[in-house]
C-alpha cells in the first residue's frame, strides 16, 4: 500500500462509475430482497448491539465499563471488513498512525512502525534508533522489538483492542502513547470445530494474489483441547522496475538496469502456523502454551518514484505510473517464531497470572543503495574517491547486504483481587530482555583493496554490532468504590532500563581517519568485524503514575477523568562525541465518556485530551549517514476521539470512528544540547552552534506541526443484511479518510519531501452465507485512489531528497473468498 501525487493516467471503464451509483449499489439491496424467502417481520426491529468483553485492564470487563479511550474490532467486524494484515485494521482505528518498514534494510513489508495519538517526531534514521512509542501485544505477550512490531496475519482472531493514551502503568515501556492488543481465539474443550477459507484477488494493473487459511479445534477430553491455525498467501505486486540508465558526473560512467527490469516486482509469499494447547488442571488452574511461526519472502520496493515519466530523470514518458528505476537486488527473507506460556489460577479468592514469552526473528535482506552514490557524486564530486586496484575510477553505486537477528524474552507475574469487592487491586512484576544483532555490508563492486573495510572485499562500510535493552518493573493499581457509582483508581510503575551497544561500524582505515577501523580500541573480531570501536552502556531508574475518577451515571452511561504518564526508555548514541539520550515522558490529561442509548441500539463513546511530551527523542541521519538521537524539546497534542455504533434497523448497522489532533512543538528545536544536557531552545539567526557553525534559526520553530499524524482521521462503515434463498446476504460499504501529513519535523527536510496528501479510500463488499459456508466478493480501494501513506529517500533528505519514494495505497483490488466451517 502506498502514496504520492495523483498523476494523470488512462481512463479505465470502472472509474467511470459515478460515486452516487456506487453508493446506491451498495445500499440498495431491494433487487435481491424482492426475491428473498421472507421479509423482516415486525419483531425483528428489536435488534440491539452485542456486548463486547475486553481485557484491556488485565481482567475481563464490559467495554462500556472501562474508563479508557478504547476501540475494539471484534471477530465479526474483522471478518466483515476483510481484515488480513496491519494496514487493513490500521485505517479503521482513528488513533493509530503508522510508517512502513521492511525487515533489515528492505523497504517492503515486514515490521510495523505504529504511532498513537500523534506522538511521533518523524525521522530518517535507521537501526540503533529510539524504541517505538506505542506497543503491540499478541494475547499477553509483547511483540514490539527495537525496530518495530510483528505484522501478524489476521485469521482466527478474537478481537483487536486499541488502547489510546499512556498505558505504562499496567503495560511495558513502549506503551508510552498507547497499546494495540491482538487477541487470538483459544482452544475450546467443549467441542470439535474447524474451518477453512480460500481467497483469490486481482490488483488493477498488477498481479494475482491468493490466500489459503484454516483452523481446527480438537478436544482431547473435558479438560483439554488443541487449536491449530495455518495460512499460506501470495501478495501480488503492482510496482514495476522499469528500464533506465544513470550517468555519474565525475567519472562519466553509465550504468544500465536491463537485467533487473520486472513487472509487478514487489510481491511477497508468506506461510505460517499457530498452535495452542489449553489444559485445565482443575477448576482453578489452567495452562496454555502457544507457538506461532511465520516465514515471508518478499521482493521489490514498495516505494514509487514520483518522477516516473519525467525525461529529466531518465524515464520514458510512457512509463507505468507505479514504477521505479532500481539497479540492484531488493529482497527480504524473514523468519520468526514466538513461544509463550500462560498460567492462570487462583490463590484463595485472588487471580494469579504468569506469562512467559520468547521470540526469535532472523531477517536476511538486500537493498538498492545506488541513489546514495549518485547524489553524493552530483553534489560534492564524491565519485572521485571510488577506484579499483589499478587506480581507475569505478561505478560508485552501493548496494546493501544485511542480516538482522532479534531476540526477546519476557516474564510477567501479576495478581488481581476479586472484581466484585469495593476495594480492588492489580499488582505485578515484569522483566524483559531484547537484543538486536546487526550485520550490514555496504558494497561497491571492484573497490580497491586499500580502501575497503579491512578483511571485507568490495565493502566500503560495515556495521557489525549487538544492541541489548533490558527492562525491569514493579507495577500496581488500586481501585476503591467511593460510592456505588463513583470509583477512584491510582496506579504506579517503578522501572529500571539498561541499554548497551557493542561492535564495529564504519570504513576501513585506508578510506577514513575519523570513522571506522581508525577508531578501534580493541582487536576483538566482534561478529566478524575487523575490530571493536564501540562498547557503551547506560541505565535509568524512574517511575510513572496514573489517577482515574469514574462516575457511573447509570447502567448505560459513564464519564471519567484521567491523569496518566507514559515513558519510552533512553539509550546511547553510536557516535562517541554524543551523550546518551534519556527517557522521554508523556503526560496525559483526559476526559472521556461511554454511553449507550435507545435500548442499546446506539453506542457513543469519546475522549477529549491534552498530552504534554517532554524532551522527546528525535532520531535522524547525521554525518556519514550515522544515526543520531537527541532529546529534542517539548510538544503538545490536543485531541478529540469519537467512536460510534448504531443498529439503525434490524437489517442496517453503522459503525464509525473519528479523531482530531492538534500536535505541535511548544519550543524551538535547535538541534543541540546545553551544557547541562537539556535541549537548546533559543537559537535566532546568527547563533553559533557548539561546532562553530552559524545557524540561520531553529531547525523547527515553536508551533511547528508534528509529522506522521493527520489533523483528522475517520472511518464510516454501513452493512445491510437481508434474507435470501434460505441464507443471509449482505451489502457493505466502508469509507476511510485521512488528512494531509508532514513527513519530517525539521523545516528544511519537510520542504524537500512536501506534504503527504489527504485521501479517502472506499471498500465495497457483498456476500451470502447459508448454514456453515459463505461466499464473499470484495472491492478494496474501489475508486483506485492514490492514497499517500509514506515518503522516504535512500539517504538523508537534504542529499537524496530530490529522488524520494512515495508509498501508495494498494490499487483497486477485486477479490473472491469462499469459507466453510464444520
Question: What kind of region is each of these model predictions?
Answer:
Residues 1-93, 217, 283, 287, ...:
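N-terminal Sec signal peptide and the immediately downstream disordered periplasmic leader
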Residues 126-127, 133-164, 214:
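Short acidic/polar hinge/loop motifs at secondary-structure boundaries
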Residues 213, 340-370, 552-568, 582-647, ...:
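Membrane-embedded beta-barrel scaffold of Gram-negative outer-membrane proteins
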Residues 238-264, 299-327, 368-401, 441-464, ...:
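Solvent-exposed loop segments that connect transmembrane elements
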Residues 86, 112-115, 162, 175-198, ...:
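N-terminal periplasmic accessory domains that precede
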Residues 2-4, 725, 736-748, 767-822:
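C-terminal beta-signal and adjacent terminal beta-strands/loops
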Amino acid at each position: 500500500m502506498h502514496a504520492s501525487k495523483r498523476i494523470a493516467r488512462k481512463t479505465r471503464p470502472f472509474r467511470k462509475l459515478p460515486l452516487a451509483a456506487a453508493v446506491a449499489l451498495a445500499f440498495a439491496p431491494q433487487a435481491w430482497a424482492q426475491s428473498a424467502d421472507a421479509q423482516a417481520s415486525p419483531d425483528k426491529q428489536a435488534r440491539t448491539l452485542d456486548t463486547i468483553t475486553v481485557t484491556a485492564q488485565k481482567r475481563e470487563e464490559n467495554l462500556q465499563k472501562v474508563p479508557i479511550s478504547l476501540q475494539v474490532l471484534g471477530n465479526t467486524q474483522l471478518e466483515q471488513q476483510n481484515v488480513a494484515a496491519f494496514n487493513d485494521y490500521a485505517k479503521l482505528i482513528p488513533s493509530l498512525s503508522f510508517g512502513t518498514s521492511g525487515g533489515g534494510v528492505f523497504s517492503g513489508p515486514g515490521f510495523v512502525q505504529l504511532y498513537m495519538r500523534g506522538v511521533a517526531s518523524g525521522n530518517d534514521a535507521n537501526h540503533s534508533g529510539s524504541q517505538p512509542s506505542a506497543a503491540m501485544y499478541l494475547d499477553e505477550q509483547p511483540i514490539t522489538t527495537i525496530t518495530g512490531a510483528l505484522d501478524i496475519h489476521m485469521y482466527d482472531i478474537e478481537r483487536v483492542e486499541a488502547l489510546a493514551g499512556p498505558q505504562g502503568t499496567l503495560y511495558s515501556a513502549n506503551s508510552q502513547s498507547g497499546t494495540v492488543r491482538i487477541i487470538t481465539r483459544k482452544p475450546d474443550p467443549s467441542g470439535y470445530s474447524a474451518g477453512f477459507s480460500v481467497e483469490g484477488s486481482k490488483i488493477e494493473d498488477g498481479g494475482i494474489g491468493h490466500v489459503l487459511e484454516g483452523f481446527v479445534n480438537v478436544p482431547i477430553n473435558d479438560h483439554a483441547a488443541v487449536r491449530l491455525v495455518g495460512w499460506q498467501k501470495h501478495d501480488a505486486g503492482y510496482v514495476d522496475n522499469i528500464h533506465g540508465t544513470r550517468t555519474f558526473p565525475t567519472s562519466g560512467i553509465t550504468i544500465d538496469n536491463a537485467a533487473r527490469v520486472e513487472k509487478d516486482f514487489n510481491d511477497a509469499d508468506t506461510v505460517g502456523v499457530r498452535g495452542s494447547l489449553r489444559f485445565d488442571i482443575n477448576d482453578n488452574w489452567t495452562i496454555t502454551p502457544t507457538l506461532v511461526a511465520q516465514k515471508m519472502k518478499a521482493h521489490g520496493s514498495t516505494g514509487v518514484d514520483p518522477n516516473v515519466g519525467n525525461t529529466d530523470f531518465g524515464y520514458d514518458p510512457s512509463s507505468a505510473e507505479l514504477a521505479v528505476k532500481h539497479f540492484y537486488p531488493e529482497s527480504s527473507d524473514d523468519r520468526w517464531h514466538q513461544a509463550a506460556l500462560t498460567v492462570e489460577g487462583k490463590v484463595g479468592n485472588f487471580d494469579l497470572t504468569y506469562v512467559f514469552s520468547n521470540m526469535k526473528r532472523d531477517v536476511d535482506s538486500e537493498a538498492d543503495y545506488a541513489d546514495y552514490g549518485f547524489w553524493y557524486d552530483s553534489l560534492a564530486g564524491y565519485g572521485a574517491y571510488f577506484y579499483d586496484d589499478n587506480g581507475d575510477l569505478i561505478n560508485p553505486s552501493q548496494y546493501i547486504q544485511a542480516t538482522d537477528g532479534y531476540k526477546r524474552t519476557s516474564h510477567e507475574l501479576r495478581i488481581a483481587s476479586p472484581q466484585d469487592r469495593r476495594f480492588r487491586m492489580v499488582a505485578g512484576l515484569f522483566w524483559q530482555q531484547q537484543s538486536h544483532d546487526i550485520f550490514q555490508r555496504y558494497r561497491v563492486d571492484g573497490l580497491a583493496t586499500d580502501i575497503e573495510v579491512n578483511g571485507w572485499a568490495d565493502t566500503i562500510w560495515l556495521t557489525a554490532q549487538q544492541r541489548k535493552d533490558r527492562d525491569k518493573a514493579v507495577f500496581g493499581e488500586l481501585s476503591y468504590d467511593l460510592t456505588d457509582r463513583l470509583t477512584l483508581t491510582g496506579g504506579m510503575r517503578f522501572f529500571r532500563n539498561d541499554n548497551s551497544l557493542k561492535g564495529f561500524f564504519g570504513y576501513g582505515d585506508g578510506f577514513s581517519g575519523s570513522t571506522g577501523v581508525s577508531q578501534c580500541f580493541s582487536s576483538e573480531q566482534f561478529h566478524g568485524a575487523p575490530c571493536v570501536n564501540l562498547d557503551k552502556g547506560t541505565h535509568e531508574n524512574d517511575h510513572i503514575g496514573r489517577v482515574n475518577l469514574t462516575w457511573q451515571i447509570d447502567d448505560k452511561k459513564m464519564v471519567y477523568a484521567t491523569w496518566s504518564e507514559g515513558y519510552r526508555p533512553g539509550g546511547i548514541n553510536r557516535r562517541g562525541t554524543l551523550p546518551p539520550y534519556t527517557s522521554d515522558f508523556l503526560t496525559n490529561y483526559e476526559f472521556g465518556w461511554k454511553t449507550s442509548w435507545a435500548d442499546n441500539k446506539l453506542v457513543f463513546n469519546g475522549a477529549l485530551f491534552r498530552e504534554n511530551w517532554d524532551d522527546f527523542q528525535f532520531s535522524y541521519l547525521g554525518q556519514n549517514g550515522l544515526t543520531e538521537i537527541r532529546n529534542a524539546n517539548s510538544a503538545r497534542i490536543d485531541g478529540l476521539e469519537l467512536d460510534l455504533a448504531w443498529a439503525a434497523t434490524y437489517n442496517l448497522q453503522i459503525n464509525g470512528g473519528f479523531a482530531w489532533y492538534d500536535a505541535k512543538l511548544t519550543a524551538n528545536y535547535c538541534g543541540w544540547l546545553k551544557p547541562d544536557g537539556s535541549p537548546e531552545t533559543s537559537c535566532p539567526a546568527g547563533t553559533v552552534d557548539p561546532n562553530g557553525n552559524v545557524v540561520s534559526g531553529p531547525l523547527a520553530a515553536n508551533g511547528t506541526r508534528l509529522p506522521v499524524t493527520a489533523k483528522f482521521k475517520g472511518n464510516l462503515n454501513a452493512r445491510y443484511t437481508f434474507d435470501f434463498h434460505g441464507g443471509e446476504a449482505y451489502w457493505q460499504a466502508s469509507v476511510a479518510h485521512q488528512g494531509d501529513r508532514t513527513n519530517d519535523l525539521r523545516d528544511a527536510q519537510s520542504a524537500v519531501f512536501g506534504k503527504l496528501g489527504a485521501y479517502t479510500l472506499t471498500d465495497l463488499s457483498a456476500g451470502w452465507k447459508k448454514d456453515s459456508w459463505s461466499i464473499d466478493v470484495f472491492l478494496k480501494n474501489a475508486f483506485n485512489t492514490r492514497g499517500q501513506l509514506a515518503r522516504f529517500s535512500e539517504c538523508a533528505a537534504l542529499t537524496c531528497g530530490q529522488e524520494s519514494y512515495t508509498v501508495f495505497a494498494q490499487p483497486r483490488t477485486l477479490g473472491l473468498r469462499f469459507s466453510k466451517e464444520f
